[in-house]
Amino acid sequence: MKKSLIALTLAALPVAAMADVTLYGTIKAGVETSRSVFHQNGQVTEVTTATGIVDLGSKIGFKGQEDLGNGLKAIWQVEQKASIAGTDSGWGNRQSFIGLKGGFGKLRVGRLNSVLKDTGDINPWDSKSDYLGVNKIAEPEARLISVRYDSPEFAGLSGSVQYALNDNAGRHNSESYHAGFNYKNGGFFVQYGGAYKRHHQVQEGLNIEKYQIHRLVSGYDNDALYASVAVQQQDAKLTDASNSHNSQTEVAATLAYRFGNVTPRVSYAHGFKGLVDDADIGNEYDQVVVGAEYDFSKRTSALVSAGWLQEGKGENKFVATAGGVGLRHKF
């Protein structure tokens, strides 16, 4: 009897040790089709079509915490892409970190969402195509190898600061400073995210000496209704003496409402004409995405969406349309 009890106790020890470790993820895939048309001097110069089975951002992760006493906890997470097409490799290529959490807030180091990315609910679409999500305004969002502090919430208000070191260089990982705040009151919310970067290499031969971005999002979110409006301003000073100052303002809005198991949704984004040394350039754009989700259960949903994007106006423009259907399962 004693031997059986001891064996049972020993067998339970690994389970107890693993109790604070959570396996989670999302598998989502579908079929997308698109058609894009280039116009130059009023004439169609190129037409491109594409249809394919695509992964819509599948992921798998492990996270956990350990109670260190006196209200202090060690927290960690390892998350990676998990494409059903088998095109992803490596560990920790999504948000992955280790840190401490307590009454002071949360301090983490690793590959972390930028403060700007955490205001990204303005773009709620599951898509591979840039035409099926408001991805142009979302393009500056990134995950950075960085250190980040998030404050506790006081009367609905919380804040975050983040720093990415210069030696973690890359397209999105030049030396950068990030800050933001969140305010919640009932279903209403206001979010701000901003960043300042130095010596930012966008691509080969295009270097930015100073870059800053600011985004303000406001809206309402409860169990059924989601509505938000975002304004974003980017400003960059290039290292090249010619055309050294560039800026653009963008706006976006999203509206969704849940009817039983169905949630229809619509998003609109607009990019105003950018400036190069205070002169207008024709990089304005308009984008519309409409779609819906049908929940078979709390974990499994069907997705359908259609999108339209136009860059430029008049005789010189680019117009794209797209459609997609998919299936998503969370675990």
UniProtKB/Swiss-Prot annotation:
Keywords: Cell outer membrane, Ion transport, Membrane, Porin, Signal, Transmembrane, Transmembrane beta strand, Transport. InterPro entries: Gram-neg_bact_OMP, Gram_neg_porin_domain, Porin_dom_sf, Porin_Gram-ve, Porin_Gram-ve_CS, Porin_Neis. GO terms for cellular component: cell outer membrane; pore complex. CDD domains: gram_neg_porins. Residues 1-19 form the signal peptide. It comes from the Bacteria. The keyword Methyltransferase does not apply. PROSITE patterns: GRAM_NEG_PORIN. The keyword Phosphoprotein does not apply. It is found in: Cell outer membrane. Present in outer membrane vesicle formulations which are used as vaccines in human. NCBIfam families: porin_porB_Neis. Homotrimer. Belongs to the Gram-negative porin family. Serves as a slightly cation selective porin. This is Major outer membrane protein P.IB. It comes from Neisseria meningitidis serogroup B (strain ATCC BAA-335 / MC58). The gene is porB.
